Amino acid sequence: MYAVRDGNVLTLREGSNGVACLVARDLHEGGLYPICFNAEGTRTVMHRELMQVRLRSLGVSEDSVDRAVSSAYARGELTAPRELALAYMMSPRQVLFSSPDAAGRRVGAWHPHLMFYVPGATPAKFGLTQDGAGEPISVGSPGTPQAEMIVKVPKWADGSPVAGGAKDQ
């Protein structure tokens, strides 16, 4: 279990099975993004997430965070998954925003969801609509090394159902 404070990555609890979790945050006051990764996601995707969260915690602009991540991929410091990488955001206590930049709107607890990382994926590769808004399956960061198929699920980690008011942002 990891967290980031003042630019430092903190190990809150050591694991033994390759699965790891991170309490991510962005520039918004109150943003809370609990996210867990399978072993391949821990080896690859989580390092990108930690880099982004660390830079944001230092007040780095979102454009600069994006450039730093792209540069880290280009230098081989960050690597795309070689096999299925999975992340899941199942906590009903998540506080999400529509975008990590200052223009992002508070969404709150959006939907519990799984993210399957498929580098270079596009909605068309899965027969999905381009924007995916309101759909149970969508593609985030299409066409990039960070592309992910996002699949909404009906229950939170505690077993409670998604409230009818969950927002589709």
Residue ranges and their predicted role:
Residues 1-169:
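Primary mode marks residue(s) on the alpha4-beta5-alpha5 output face of response regulator receiver
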